[in-house]
């Protein structure tokens, strides 16, 4: 998806520094925002060459746009209507983990109600590293172009760039154009499949709960800039049928132009951060994370309980000053397999129910948290402390 304004400022400033010291940089991307292109040109001057290869790609997508929220029943009915297809591997991409989990449960219920035996799978970022590794291995196998299947996979933005997969059909919420086109790249990836019928179904309206809505007043919980989301709706609302790579580029250049974004909060935040970097203000803020996303690593108590003997052995190795460095690193990596990275606002030290902390190294503690976790759904709920008869 589109980089946060802070991260974009770091990247462009970093590229500028690399070239200043004689380095060469190649940026390969399927979606280059005009604003980012302009900022690169300003940072690098004449020492830049830009080429667009979108016209070389075959048409891969046929689009059907829905001006409503992404609903499980619509996905299910469409999937059933494709029963005569040799393969109908279906990828559902949601904007939040909560939405993905809901749609997964709903699709499982619909399949059971209709008595249809189909593999329905869930993948998002709130699994332990060990569980996620297994799921990613499975989706990579299913996602091979030559693999024929009727499976349904529900996921989030983690499939946009990190996984090389090729599905037959896509159902997705709109986030913004850049993210959307990355998601579409997971369908008919090599352009070898027919596009006589729609293979990408896009819901323009967000399904997420109010606190995750794009206009939320809490910027830490928002997942898209207001202006960029509104412009993306405007760009996609009249799209229908075969959707060429050139058309995608035209929409980005038209609706995400420098002029349209100039007054947006996104650009204002970018410019402020870039100015801070130019003035080396970063030295005074070296304790702040690069991205405006604060994550905390945790271990679910149920996972800890199942693997307590091995984890305690690893803790002993880590604490023992006589242990070899290689053994300590191996022990840390073993424990990392049971960790989940979650947003900071989900774990509050004075409220969250924790069992203990595991110290991996100085100033790096991993809390063991009481929560609802299993390898099917991933992390669902983090439990709060009980005090007397009250739940805080």
Can you say where each PLM-predicted feature lies in the sequence?
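Ser/Thr-glycine-rich phosphate-binding loops at phosphate-binding pockets of nucleotides
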Residues: 28-32, 96, 154-158, 172
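Conserved two-lobed SF2 helicase motor
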Residues: 145-160
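Residues immediately C-terminal
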Residues: 1-2, 33, 99, 161, ...
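C-terminal helicase lobe and adjacent C-terminal extensions/tails of nucleic-acid helicase motors
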Residues: 37, 74-93, 100-144, 167, ...
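Interdomain hinge/linker at the junction between the two RecA-like core domains of SF2 helicases
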Residues: 33-85
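Post-DEXD/H (motif II) to motif III coupling segment of the RecA-like Helicase ATP-binding lobe
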Residues: 1-54
